[in-house]
């Protein structure tokens, strides 16, 4: 009896082991070098056992092979992924050969029947549906419509600075991840929904808490990633729900209320929600479709923009000379601490350079994963024969590793905005070494709105306060291994010293 039990356990363990390693060798059989992969953990063990952020696993592989290989075969748990190391090939995948890699792997993780609020988000859509929804959002995000949000951003920036002045009085530390979420939450709710979220008051809508649950505490996202890694070909209807139901209820109710109020008041504002109502009449959209369209702005802008603001403030606080130069640029455009008009703000070269350099050091997404949609020959400089990629093959781009490669960016840990002045941004994007917002036709759909918000917040803060790093903030640029989206480990705690002769009112 005991022997039979042991045999059964051994058989079960053997079957599990065989399942976990069954895909290993997929790339080797196609002539591609494979770094060591472990059962269950795959090539990126810190995704399961997070001693450091798992993008560091990609960076380690990248640094080991970049001078001898253009790509290597890796495994996300047990899902085969081709890790592309050569920047020229990265540019091909994103831009020149885009038609062969037009789908994001995120579409394989999300069941849009379960997560209806992201059902129309271009990031998770494929093929013709992606093209259609991308066109819809292009009409929503015109320069003219973004300009109409500037008055709202001016009001929110004033509230932001008053909040900072009160909460940081006496040299108190401020949690800048929280501060960024308050700003983006207030901005997006008013710009998109016409609702003031009151995030800088003592009685706010629970925007910050809901977003924290969606990102930092979202077990559904981690589970969906693990399921995709273990069962890469799982049918869509078996995929788990990604976003918390509390998140669906909160945003669903807010969006429905915003639509109801706008209809009842018959307001004519040239803003996003007014255009959504026009689209509903023209395209016969359901309330669920309307909510999904509105939620795309929230999903794409809340977390990534707030983190980018916080990281840029951290780096400016660590580099007083850069902060001083940015302050002088802002004063030349609009002395007195008032926010410049949107066109002037967007075009400020040093502000743009500071923001892009912070995105280089702390990219909003540390990696990207694309799906081959048409057969393609990948011709790497380090390989004599091209690799034939087939539809369904997945390629990964190690964005964090590219951004922090000392051969591409000398002294990558040093905050040096000058890298992105005088055509530096265009040059880096064309080389395939800067992917702060992605690149090519599938670059971030909300990029212009996100840039407008981030630059408005940074300009307002730097003109009114000197930013100083608190001793509570850890040195270095290590990412928190427990948060899926890359955030500075230990939080970002800063102090804000009011500048002389500048009002915060």
Curated annotation (Swiss-Prot):
May be involved in the metabolism of insect hormones and in the breakdown of synthetic insecticides. This is Probable cytochrome P450 28c1. Disulfide bonds: none annotated. GO terms for cellular component: endoplasmic reticulum membrane. GO terms for molecular function: heme binding; iron ion binding; monooxygenase activity; oxidoreductase activity, acting on paired donors, with incorporation or reduction of molecular oxygen. The gene is Cyp28c1. It comes from Drosophila melanogaster. Keywords: Endoplasmic reticulum, Heme, Iron, Membrane, Metal-binding, Microsome, Monooxygenase, Oxidoreductase. It is a peripheral membrane protein.
